[in-house]
Design a protein with these regions (language model features):
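Basic- and aromatic-enriched surface patches that contact anionic nucleotides/nucleic acids
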Residues: 2-161
Length: 161
């Protein structure tokens, strides 16, 4: 009898689990300890298609979670909490609880011309070549066509249809 199964899952699948509340962090996991530059580096690795390591989950119906509830059959994160939390922060725009137990919003920016990620700062915020917060690209109802047209207009890029 198999004790475990290895699945290859896409980032889209993992984000779907997070949005649907199907994945949870157990009470025993530590707070989020990555700094913003490490989150930026993870986004860069994902963009370039580099492997980011395993994320190990376990289905257990009665594991106590960080929010005080019980897992009720959700996927419990055993290894990969920092990476999942980083993706949740950068791609879904959710706040994280840092090592001082304070809520913090991490905004990662992207420059399509240079294909480069950075942590949002005041200079980037004013520069139209940068997408100031990549999480807006993943919001429900996001209008990609309108966004691309606006980006091109702001940056003097002609429509190449």
């Amino acid at each position: 009898m198999t004790k475990y199964v290895v699945n290859n899952s896409t980032i889209d699948s993992i984000l779907g689990w997070i949005k649907a509340g199907e994945i949870a962090i157990p009470e025993i996991q530590r707070p989020f300890v990555w700094d913003s530059s490490r989150v930026r580096d993870l986004m860069d690795s994902l963009y370039k298609g580099y492997p980011i390591g395993y994320i190990i989950t376990w289905k257990n119906p009665d594991t106590k979670l960080k929010d005080g509830t019980v897992s009720l059959g959700k996927k419990i994160v055993i290894d990969g909490q920092q990476r999942i939390t980083a993706m949740t922060a950068a791609l879904l725009g959710e706040e994280v609880i840092d090592s001082d137990y304070k809520k913090k919003r991490i905004k990662i920016s992207f420059n399509p011309k240079e294909e480069r990620f950075e942590v949002l700062n005041p200079a980037i915020e004013k520069d139209t070549e940068w997408i100031d917060d990549i999480s807006k690209l993943f919001k429900h109802g996001f209008n990609m066509f309108g966004f691309v047209n606006e980006y091109c207009a702001l940056n003097g890029i002609e429509d190449t249809n």
